[in-house]
Every structure is written in C-alpha cells, then in structure tokens.
Amino acid sequence: MAEVINGILIREVETKNIMTKSSLPVGGYSVNPYVGCTHACKYCYASFMKRFTGHKEEWGTFLDVKHWPEIKNPKKYAGQRVVIGSVTDGYNPQEEQFGNTRKLLEQLIGSDADILICTKSDLVVRDIALLKKLGRVTVSWSINTLDENFKNDMDSASSIERRIAAMKLVYEAGIRTVCFVSPVFPGITDFEAIFERVKDQCDLFWLENLNLRGGFKKTIMDYIAGKHPDLVPLYDEIYNKHNRSYFEALEVKAEKMAKKYDCAFVDNEMPYGRVPQGHPVIVDYFYHEEIRGTENTGKRNR
C-alpha cells in the first residue's frame, strides 16, 4: 500500500526484526523505525540506502513505515548500545502520525539498554516521560550552524532554535543530551558560537567533519561554488586534494576551547553519565574513520 501525503510517498512495509547489529563505531544495535528520511539533508550519508531498498525516488521524498513483531525479550539488550536513527530520523514529521518510534521505546522499557536517539527534531519532547522510564537514554541533536538561512539551504528539519529549546527541556528533565556539531562545514560552521549557546544544557559536545563522497559531493561542491565562492579553494584543497590540515587545525582549536571552559576533551564518547552543568565533554570526532572498535574508551586507535 502506498499513498502520497504532503508530497511524501508513504509505504507501509513488514520487517522480520527491527533490531539490527550495528557496524557503527558506537557498536551495539542500530534501529530504524522508518526507511528514508524526509528532512532531505543535502549532505546525508544515509542516501546510499536506496541501493539496498530499491527506491527510485529522490532521497527525502519517500518514507517507508516499518511494521515489526513485538520485541518479546527486551532484556536481551541489557547493557547494549541501541542507536535509534542511524539512517533515518525517528522523529521525522511523520512520526506524529504513525508513532513508530514511540512504539519502539515502549517495547524497550525494562531492557536496561543504553539507548542513543539521533534527531534533528523537537518532537522528541513529546516522549520525555517515556524516556525517563527507560533510564539510560541519551538524546543527540545535530546542530552545525546558528544561521537559519544556511540550515534551510541544507535541510527541512526543525529550526535550530526549536532544536536548542528541545535540548534544554530534555536536559532539565534529567536525560543526558548531546549537541552533535555535524557535519562541520569548513569556513561556515562556528562551533565555538554553538558551544556558547548550548554548553549549559548538554553533557556531550560532539564534533564531526564534513565528509563528501558519492552523489552528494557534487551537490555540496556546487552549493559552495554558488553561495560561497570564496571558499571554493579551501573545499578543493580538502575534498579534491585530500589535505587534512584544516581539520587538524580545528582539532587544536577544539582542544584549546576545552581548556578554556574546563571541559574534558576526548577522541570518542565516554561511558554513560552526566557532567557538571556548563562543562560538557567535548568529543573530537574529526577522525571518526580511525575510531571503529574504540567505543566507550574515549581514545582513538593510533
């Protein structure tokens, strides 16, 4: 069954198991209540999923609503990292209608899993009471700019101000929060300005560089040429000549920022926990391709 709702092609599909072993550096399980994502981010790495799902539609214009057998033994995932939204956003606008993410969270009550929710939405505040029942939960918002115009050029998700407001509400409810500054656009993303806005309402401040590969490399390079022509030489140096010195300099800047604000500075996420307000752990994920297998150690393989 398929129908078009507000310009999005919606299908309802059956899946045998909603829990999938993850190949992400954070390990554990990857759980995606939907196929596709209607935020239509221009830099989205998850657009590669079309190769496996058979979708011909443009990324961001379709959404498959999954139906799965109830999770009968949630305790099976005790102590495991469960990432919700690795290749979708569980709180996309359609979640308000279909409620798949809420259903998933209800099925994980009592699991004692270490749950990480990745989103660009403020809809997550709807489920604060439910998240508190789950215990070990972290909610991460992607915020890579304070400029709403640039944000609107890149995605159709909630405004930056709405994301920041949602983060504050979730943080004040006692739930661990992350500001995921991803992707850091060279010459555009001012991560210290973002830090100033969110440092009192997040436990982790996570930095990840912009990676350009596949079909969206041309999309972003064309955007830079059209909107930021002064940055073309820098992007050519980084993404065509593979010069990493820009991000090496940003890593140094981030470490200095950590010292300035008396924050821990690590190469990867530390084990679950809250930190003193105003002193979030700053996570250097500029070298995430080197981090695989180091989850919860705080150190990169060197």
Predicted features by range, described:
Residues 2-14, 192-302:
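Auxiliary Fe-S-binding modules of radical SAM enzymes
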